[in-house]
């Protein structure tokens, strides 16, 4: 999920005179309350989740700074011995403990997800799955498909 709360707002004066080389391509409302009450509740929940994930994110950003290991990783980054992970183009690891499998088509409510070796907890149902297999997952508009590696404390933020 994109969690953007910043950016250009509607202009109050022409910036061209002050900054002739700057092109402002946006200017629309982008605050979470700008998209209606139903969407506000969804976006507010995502912002709150991001805040709960802050220590996890900071840890992996520090690690990225020290080692160059990205926080958002292709599946084969951590599971290089699993050949299936080299074929996955639409799911990724977020650090070592969170697996995201986005729904990317409008109207889609489910998808197949490959879980690599280990035990994985569905963040929506808290059901535990054994890895090295495909599972079918569903999610509503206000949810996303994600799994946490069993044993990780990050499950507590979901």
Language-model-derived ranges and their functions:
Residues 1-157:
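Catalytic-domain carbohydrate-binding cleft regions of carbohydrate-active enzymes
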């Amino acid at each position: 999920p994109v969690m953007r709360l910043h950016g250009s707002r509607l202009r109050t004066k022409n910036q061209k005179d002050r900054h002739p080389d700057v092109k402002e391509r946006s200017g629309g409302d982008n605050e979470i309350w700008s998209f209606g009450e139903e969407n506000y509740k969804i976006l507010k929940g995502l912002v709150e989740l991001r805040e709960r994930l802050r220590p996890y994110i900071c840890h992996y950003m520090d690690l990225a700074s020290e080692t160059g290991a990205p926080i958002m990783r292709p599946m084969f980054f951590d599971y290089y011995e699993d050949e299936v992970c080299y074929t996955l183009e639409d799911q990724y690891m977020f650090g070592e403990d969170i697996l995201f499998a986005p729904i990317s088509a409008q109207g889609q409510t489910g998808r197949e997800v490959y879980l690599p070796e280990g035990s994985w907890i569905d963040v929506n149902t808290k059901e535990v799955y054994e890895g090295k297999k495909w599972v079918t997952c569903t999610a509503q508009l206000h949810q996303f498909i994600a799994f946490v590696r069993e044993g990780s404390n990050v499950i507590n933020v979901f």
